[in-house]
């Protein structure tokens, strides 16, 4: 339903950006964009006007999904520099549609993710449908994900680890993802205890923070 709604606003092959933090609606958009043959441009929700203008302009995004009025105000500052941007939509407020879905080429672009830009402007990394899903499958196999595993995802969705390796890896192994809006070590341990998490993932600084939080407020993670 969401994919069909997207096709009332965009044409298959067009880039569509998502500028928002983690949430179930983000994942819905990820899958719907793939089904609709759109290229999802993932945007760091911490971006300010100039960074946002660079990513939206460079990718040629035809639309952007966002959540807050504050984001809309930031976008207004650079909107006149983005001639290809037609639509500004609220994430979760899906357009209605009932048309057919296209046949999507596995070699076509699925997502455009941007690097951190530590030595200059963020650079685009284009991921195909086949590459994205195979990478997630191989990563899941490498860490030993199994059917029934539960993981509280601490990684941001604008990063390939969050939206690709973990999200798609769990889907392919019939696991369960608990969505964490943003990394909070105490909250992550609380949810891991509540939902009986079987796997913990994250970058080293996150794991260090989790160990410190567990010392302050121990949880039953058995």
Regions found by a protein language model. Name each.
Residues 110-137:
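Conserved AMP-binding A3 loop
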């Amino acid at each position: 339903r969401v994919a069909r709604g997207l096709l009332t606003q965009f044409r298959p092959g067009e880039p569509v950006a998502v500028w928002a933090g983690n949430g179930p609606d983000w994942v819905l958009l990820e899958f719907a964009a793939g089904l609709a043959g759109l290229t999802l441009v993932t945007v760091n929700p911490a971006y300010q006007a100039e960074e946002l203008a660079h990513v939206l302009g460079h990718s040629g995004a035809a639309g952007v999904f966002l959540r807050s009025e504050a984001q809309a105000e930031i976008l207004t500052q650079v909107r006149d520099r983005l001639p290809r941007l037609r639509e500004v939509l609220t994430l979760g407020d899906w357009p209605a549609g009932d048309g057919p879905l296209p046949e999507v080429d596995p070699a076509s672009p699925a997502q455009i993710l941007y690097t951190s830009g530590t030595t200059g402007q963020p650079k685009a990394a284009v991921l195909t449908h086949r590459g994205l899903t195979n990478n997630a499958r191989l990563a899941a196999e490498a860490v030993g994900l199994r059917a029934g595993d539960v993981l509280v995802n601490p990684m941001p969705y604008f990063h390939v680890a969050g939206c690709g390796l973990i999200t798609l890896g769990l889907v392919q192994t019939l696991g369960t993802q608990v969505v964490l809006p943003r990394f909070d070590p105490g909250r992550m341990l609380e949810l891991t205890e509540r939902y009986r998490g079987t796997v913990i993932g994250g970058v080293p600084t996150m794991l260090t923070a989790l160990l410190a939080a567990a010392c302050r407020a121990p949880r039953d993670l058995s």
